[in-house]
């Protein structure tokens, strides 16, 4: 950990009163969960949540570095706050997350107005790090460390659906991905600690949990214990069985899965356990085996297809979503077309797409056969059009069906509608008949008849 005392005291004025904070989160669900924990820590310290970023006494950016545009957005935000700090020296500026881990001390040099740079493994150490800042130091905390179990202070954004981290880090070495170098090695939490957190959520009237991990189906590989059959004792499958009996929790989800570890046993558990939702997010990244090999993904398209077939053989209406990268270095037009074909053949419910973006400290960034920006834009546009078409077709299967929707709140764009999600994770807007007096609470499950299907959402009417 780097601690640098600020010599120019005009740059630092210790604020004798605890003020307000603002957190902006970039990137994945793991970052969202980390932001909730940091918000809880700040409120425990006495900070209150600001209504306006430009009025906050402490501004924290929880950052992402998976693509270059995410980084540039952070630097844009920092530039605005740096100017503000020159006018208000007591303002505390914090950068957390993957960009902080990647850049470390160099980020303090690039943006000298920063007080604290901290990697993802230091989320639970925020209070101690801010204590060093209060002593007049600039701090960079990016060394790899064991992640503590302190999750008690999380300030949840939802009062119904809760994130639960079960494994941190990633041991894979995909040639395009910076995550292992910024998130560190895999660290699985022990089952009892996970169940205890879920029980607390249930006690607080949460109805749905989402288990999180960069590679969630690799959960337990680093934990001790082996069964008589020779497999690891604590796997994601075992964990699902273990937590299933927590009373009050109605729905269980998990993300993100890696095809390499997605087993028949896991599929069978999802089929047998009625709280586990029929939604599977399994990135395929490319529809071409040669590109998958260059990506170092560790599976073939045939294996990926078998996973989907095994899921649908038990759960025909399961929702399958995925991630895909286009214009990977050296990707030919024919290889790109294989990705389009896979999307059409499988009929994904949704695919999150991105054009390849070179990342620091990754093998693919050094290759000389990079694809032009023009081709990247063309391929991304075409694949997005296909995804929109297939997503709408998949959603049209719901027309005239009755779906159970967990209420999450009102539609912010239409106060006459409430909104929630189906078990298959379809965002659903619900019309309430004007002549009906309908009392509901967040977390209620209601039956909805679907009468409209759009590419990424459904609309229906309350079933009476």
UniProtKB/Swiss-Prot annotation:
Entry cofactors: [4Fe-4S] cluster
Residue intervals of the TRAM domain: 396-464
Recorded family membership: Belongs to the methylthiotransferase family. MiaB subfamily.
Chain ranges of the Radical SAM core domain: 156-393
Species assigned in the record: Prochlorococcus marinus (strain MIT 9215)
Chain positions recorded as [4Fe-4S] cluster 2 binding sites: 170, 174, 177
E.C. numbers: 2.8.4.3
UniProt GO BP: tRNA methylthiolation
Binding site for [4Fe-4S] cluster 1: 28, 64, 98
Gene3D superfamilies per record: Methylthiotransferase, N-terminal domain (3.40.50.12160), tm_1862 like domain (3.80.30.20)
Keyword annotations: 4Fe-4S, Cytoplasm, Iron, Iron-sulfur, Metal-binding, S-adenosyl-L-methionine, Transferase, tRNA processing
PROSITE patterns registered for this protein in UniProt: MTTASE_N, MTTASE_RADICAL, RADICAL_SAM, TRAM
Complexes and interactors: Monomer.
Protein name: tRNA-2-methylthio-N(6)-dimethylallyladenosine synthase
Membrane in keyword set: no
Locations listed in the record: Cytoplasm
């Amino acid at each position: 950990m780097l601690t640098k005392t600020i010599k120019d005291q005009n740059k630092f004025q210790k604020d004798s009163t605890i003020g307000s904070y603002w957190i902006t989160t970039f990137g994945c669900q793991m970052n969202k969960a980390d932001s909730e924990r940091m918000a809880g820590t700040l409120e425990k310290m006495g900070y209150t949540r600001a209504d306006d970023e430009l009025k906050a006494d402490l501004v924290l950016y929880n950052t992402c570095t998976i693509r270059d545009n995410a980084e540039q957005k952070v630097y844009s935000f920092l530039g605005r706050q740096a100017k503000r700090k020159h006018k208000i020296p007591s303002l505390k500026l914090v950068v957390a997350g993957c960009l902080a881990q990647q850049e470390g001390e160099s980020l303090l040099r690039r943006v000298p107005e920063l007080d604290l740079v901290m990697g993802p493994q230091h989320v639970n150490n925020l209070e101690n790090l801010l204590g060093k800042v209060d002593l007049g130091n600039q701090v960079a905390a990016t060394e790899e460390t064991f992640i503590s179990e302190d999750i008690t202070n999380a300030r949840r954004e939802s009062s119904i659906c809760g994130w639960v981290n079960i494994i941190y880090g990633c041991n894979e070495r995909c040639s395009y991905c910076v995550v292992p170098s910024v998130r560190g090695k895999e660290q699985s939490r022990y089952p009892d600690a996970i169940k205890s957190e879920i029980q607390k959520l249930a006690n607080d009237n949460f109805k749905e949990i989402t288990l999180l991990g960069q590679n969630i189906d690799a959960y337990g590989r680093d934990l001790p214990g082996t069964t008589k059959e020779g497999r690891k004792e604590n796997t994601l499958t075992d964990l699902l069985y273990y937590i299933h009996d927590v009373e009050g929790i109605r729905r269980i989800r998990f993300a993100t899965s890696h095809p390499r570890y997605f087993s028949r046993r896991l599929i069978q558990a999802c089929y047998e356990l009625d709280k586990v939702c029929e939604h599977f997010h399994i990135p395929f990244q490319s529809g071409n085996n040669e590109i998958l090999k260059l990506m170092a993904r560790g599976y073939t398209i045939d294996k990926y297809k078998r996973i989907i077939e095994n899921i649908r053989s038990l759960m025909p209406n399961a929702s399958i979503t995925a991630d895909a990268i286009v214009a990977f270095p050296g990707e030919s037009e024919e290889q790109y077309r294989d990705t389009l074909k896979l999307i059409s053949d499988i009929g994904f419910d949704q695919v999150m797409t991105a054009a390849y973006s070179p990342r620091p400290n990754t093998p693919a960034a050094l290759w000389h056969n990079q694809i032009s920006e023009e081709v990247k834009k063309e391929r991304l546009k075409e694949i997005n059009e296909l995804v929109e078409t297939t997503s709408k077709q998949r959603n049209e299967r719901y027309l005239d069906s009755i779906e159970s929707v967990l209420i999450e709140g009102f539609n912010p764009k239409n106060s006459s509608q409430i909104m929630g999600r189906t078990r298959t994770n379809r965002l659903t807007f619900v019309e309430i008949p004007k002549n009906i007096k309908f009392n509901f609470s967040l977390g209620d499950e209601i039956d909805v008849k679907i009468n409209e299907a759009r590419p990424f959402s459904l609309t229906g009417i309350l079933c009476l």
